Amino acid sequence: YDGNYAAPEQGLDFSHISLTNLNTSIDSILYQGKEINAHIKEFFVEERSGLKVSALAGNVRSDHEQIDVPDLLLQTPNSEVRLTATIPWSSLEDHPQGSMKALLNASLGKEDLLIAAGSLPEDFKKAYPDKPLAITAGVEGNLSSIRITQGDIMLPGAFQMNVTGSMESVTDSIRRTGEIQLKARSGNLDFLLAMLPASQRDQFAIPAGIQLKGEATVANQEYRTELVLTQDKGKVGLTARYNPVKLA
């Protein structure tokens, strides 16, 4: 797939996808309207960037009432992503009734993250922690009301982050309301200094134990955010709002 005439970027470039060595095994296939049943046994593919999918296995089932993904597992030589979901068709309707549930657990290895990031300084690639980035994300609800039940991101020794929140009238840009809470704490972030020229790195220091708390809200077509960053006795606050209607 080539989305434009520019040369492919280094790393994973979604405008230039080139797949090779595709090998898959799927049995028990049924597709008739909303009735779907597929058992994925094997899947292997390589992408131009160096990213490899070494396994994709699991079941996908659907009937007239809901879609079930009891346990879908995707693996690369360095990463693992697991998805469990139950999605009633009624939760996707204009006037939703049912409630979907989805939980994603991911462990993303350094090698795959650097491929996805594209062009980066070589010193940064070496300095980035050789530990997996752990992600847990869970949602419940429908297009009328949805809630983040779990939202955790952690790079061991470097940082951890927690996100919770909810939104009402998800697809209605006028009546939409919602709020998201954010909490984060840093550990050792010295590897970020490797993004700077070597001659400038000694001029900066990133302290450990930085805490970030914040909230973002939307109501009456206005978006607001409040963030507070603290470290030891220091504190920095940010308050912002954006109303596209008033700017029109």
Protein language model features and the residues they cover:
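Short Pro/Gly-enriched beta-strand edge/turn motifs at strand-loop
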Residues: 7, 38-41, 117-120, 194-198
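Extracellular loop and loop/strand-boundary signature of outer-membrane beta-barrel proteins
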Residues: 9-11, 121-125, 198-202
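Generic short beta-strand segments
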Residues: 1-6, 39-45, 72, 107-109, ...
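Outer-membrane beta-barrel translocator domains and adjoining extracellular loop/strand segments
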Residues: 51, 193-197, 240
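Long, compositionally biased, intrinsically disordered segments
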Residues: 104-109, 116-119, 128, 133, ...
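Extended lipid/amphipathic-ligand handling interfaces
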Residues: 1-3, 17-32, 54-65, 71-74, ...
